[in-house]
Amino acid sequence: MNKIKFADYNEGQDIPELRVGPIKQMDLVRYAGASGDFNPIHNDVEFAKSAGLPGTIAHGMYIMALMGRQVTNWAPPTQVKFFGVKFKGMSLPGETMVFTGKIKKKKEENGDKLLMVSLTAANDKGEVKVSGDLTVKAE
């Protein structure tokens, strides 16, 4: 993986997109096993409906993990200085998720060359499910 170089990027520039999906119920089962989160809203359709949901929903942390994959496909983990998200909506089985990012600011601070990136996870209809912020320490 190539290091991110400060001079190679400009404000407003996109980072590489990641598309994942459609999300399958089995993806949620696998994530539940890996994370230990067996809340039935993620794996029991009838329970989820009884809780007022349209059906099962993806774990928010699963969607965040996919966003993390987008980040580390682009930047080596050693260059990630900050990664945080806000959950905006529920992701459902059958949806294809599109992860995008845009460099919103370049700055030098205390000798560090930083790229500030805004991240978005939306379904293929454009409905935003997660937004995030990323800071990369560039070379």
Labelled PLM ranges:
Residues 33-36, 72-76, 124:
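Short, intrinsically disordered, mixed-charge
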Residues 39-41, 80-82, 87-88, 117, ...:
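Short, intrinsically disordered/low-complexity patches at protein termini
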Residues 1-15, 90-139:
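HotDog/MaoC-like acyl-thioester-processing domains
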Residues 1-56:
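Catalytic strand-loop segment that frames the active site of acyl-thioester-processing enzymes
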Residues 19-22, 86, 135-137:
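Generic structural detector for well-ordered beta-strands
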Residues 49-58, 62-103:
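Hydrophobic beta-strand-centered segment that forms part of the acyl-chain substrate-binding groove
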